[in-house]
Amino acid sequence: MIAVAGGCGGGASGEEALRIGLIPNQAPDEVEAEYQPLGDYLSEELGREVELFVPTGYPAVVEAMANDEIDLALFGGLTYVQARERAEVSPLVTDINPRTGDTTYRSVIVVPSDSDIQAVDELEGADFAFGSVSSTSGSLYPSIMLAGAGIDYRTDLGEFTYTGGHDATAAAVASGNVDAGGLEYRILLDLEEEGTIEPGSVRVIERSAPVEGYPWVVRDALPEETRDEIADAFLNIDDEELLSLLNADGYERVEAADYDYVEEQARQLDLLTES
């Protein structure tokens, strides 16, 4: 698997680089560009080099954490609980969502705007697009919403596909290549605002319950002082330009228990093992 890697300068000589993994919830080059300024900030705050690792699939970040190849990772809730099955890791912080004012976001199921489908219970036998199989809002929560309407994604859909990212799912639905798809709502809004998909080309038919935000997760083997320094660096971000680039109003602490519901649902839906 090919990674997009970048060094962020300014670290003190002799310090080992902090290796950061990022799930590719959109195209890897876009993810790396989005988080490069954060890498620069962390390098400055921590006094060490920072290396970014953005693979082409979610499971590679879990694998890298399990193999001690990265120290810190931005996971979704599902990839975090997958990682904690295989490694000693802990969540530190998550972002405050500007659209909700808290640390949650939502997943949605969408259909083409001209579709006759009005509700999730009409999707039996439909062709459906998920994002990555390991995506919280692109796989797990759409599966939860389908299950709530009596549809088991494993047996009751027509054909289903994993597009690999929210942007690809939105494009597949907007073009009519599938009957419906699931993705993160705030990413859908961003894709419409930036013109990646035509505004109004898809229609939301279901919104999930609030989802706890993407956790920044650290290896427990790192010294406690280092883990605290990393958490403090996030909590102390006050640069409005940087926060805007990160699509965050700030950061708050999170705990392992905040993601227990994700683990419970993933077990029930056979999504706990990364693919």
For every predicted segment, state its role.
Residues 18-21, 26-37, 209-213, 217-275:
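An extracytoplasmic/periplasmic, membrane-proximal ligand-sensing/linker region
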Residues 48, 66-75, 87-90, 126-128, ...:
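Alpha-to-beta junction loops
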Residues 90-101, 156-159, 192-210:
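Short beta-strand->loop
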Residues 9-12:
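Bacterial signal peptide processing site
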Residues 15, 19-43, 55, 78, ...:
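Bilobed "Venus flytrap"/periplasmic-binding protein-like clamshell domains
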Residues 3-7:
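C-terminal motif of bacterial Sec signal peptides marking the signal peptidase cleavage site
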Residues 105-109, 202, 212-218:
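Small-molecule pocket liners
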Residues 77-88, 145-148, 174, 179-199:
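A ligand-binding cleft/hinge motif common to bilobed small-molecule-binding domains
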